[in-house]
Amino acid sequence: MRRGLLLLNLGTPDNADIRAVKLYLREFLTDKRVIDLPTIPRYILVYCLILPFRSPKSAQAYQSIWTEKGSPLLYHSQNLVTKLQSSLKDEYKIALGMRYGTPSITTALAELKDCHSLTILPLFPQYSSAATGSAIEKTLSYLANQEIIPSIKIIRDFYQRPEYIQAQAKIMKPYIKDNFHVLFSYHGIPERHIHKSGCDTLCPQTCTPIYDKNQACYRAQCYQTSLLLAKELQLGTHQYTTAFQSRLGKTPWIKPYTDEIFAELISKGIKNIVVSCPSFVADCLETLEEIGIRAKEQWEKLGGEQFILTPCMNDHPEWIKAIHSIVNEQI
């Protein structure tokens, strides 16, 4: 009997028009792990304040990165499945499930219904309740209602895995030039999510090293990722910076903020930067539009000169090899 491998990612609208984007945002933002408010306040916030104003802006952003093949996140993910299936051959049957939108987690699990064992790999290198936790919860809630539940293995995070670090570094390396500063930009989360992960206080700087108390701290895992990548790329501490992007609303999110770090870098005389987004394994709205378009424009307006965004791992052969190794070690 075959083993199943379920790859999970966040999701994408079906197309880039306002209606599709609004439907996607509604599903995403009403998730209690994403906006962790009681149900009624959460729904008031989403339906009355966020959706009416954010949907048109988000649709415009999606339109700026949409291609003839559709959503970059979706086609990169589908290409990954195809190439990974070729690499793993008959070892696994692979399916892709998106937490929001299509293909859904339910659809993906239906494809794997004949598998006697299931490895669940959320494609989020660093653990967060809002992304990883939500995707795993959705998966397990479906499986809990099945007559036959397969043996299950969950790969919760893989930020510290040498295969991931090496793959990420190999993709970045050709873009790093002399006199360029490296900026690692991670997706941000609200500070209160850090406290819920077991950390009583926010560390003032790097949150490293990882130990029992902060082992599920997203911010700590991000800083540890930067440290490991810098070591692999042979970067000194003065040659790179870590920051967090994509904040939503007025509540405090983890710092420093990517859009505020640029002025600080410019003030230090840095004119050329290479930006990598190690919390994203596939290029998407947050990398291509938020960083590749808006952040680049901001950098240039502040007086910066060269701005290079490295591609995500997408379906790169090194990423295929890394997943192969990570998954097989879980057997």
Swiss-Prot record:
The keyword Ribonucleoprotein does not apply. This is Ferrochelatase. Its main location: cytoplasm. One of its GO terms (molecular function) is ferrochelatase activity. Fe cation binds at H187, E286. GO terms for cellular component: cytoplasm. Catalyzes the ferrous insertion into protoporphyrin IX. NCBIfam families: hemH. CDD domains: Ferrochelatase_C, Ferrochelatase_N. The keyword Iron applies. It is found in: Cytoplasm. Pathway: Porphyrin-containing compound metabolism; protoheme biosynthesis; protoheme from protoporphyrin-IX: step 1/1. Belongs to the ferrochelatase family. Keywords: Cytoplasm, Heme biosynthesis, Iron, Lyase, Metal-binding, Porphyrin biosynthesis. Pfam families: Ferrochelatase. It catalyses: heme b + 2 H(+) = protoporphyrin IX + Fe(2+). GO terms for biological process: heme biosynthetic process. Its EC number is 4.98.1.1. InterPro entries: Ferrochelatase, Ferrochelatase_C, Ferrochelatase_N.
